[in-house]
Amino acid sequence: MTDNTLPSLSDPAATPERGSAAETVDPRLLEILVCPVTRDTLVYDAAAGELISRKAGLAYPIRDGIPIMLPEEARRLPE
């Protein structure tokens, strides 16, 4: 019999750290995602845990392995 309990969200060991292997994005998803502002391709910055749109100058965060593709959630890149 297996234990089907889920880890507690309050348990720090159960939450992946930013940029950790558990927060990587599926490469197939990266192939189809585009910047919602420019419709241009994105560059995956694994160290920062972000998808970069150079044309728009925006960095979209990745939270819990899910890209947040909302311009209002993106970080403006320095010029």
UniProtKB/Swiss-Prot annotation:
Domain of life of the organism encoding this protein: Bacteria
Pfam family, one: Trm112p
SUPFAM superfamilies referenced in this protein's UniProt entry, alphabetically: Trm112p-like
Gene Ontology CC: one annotated term: cytosol
Region (Disordered): 1-22
HAMAP family tied to this protein: UPF0434 (MF_01187)
Family stated for the protein in its record: Belongs to the UPF0434 family.
Protein name: UPF0434 protein GbCGDNIH1_0252
Species annotation: Granulibacter bethesdensis (strain ATCC BAA-1260 / CGDNIH1)
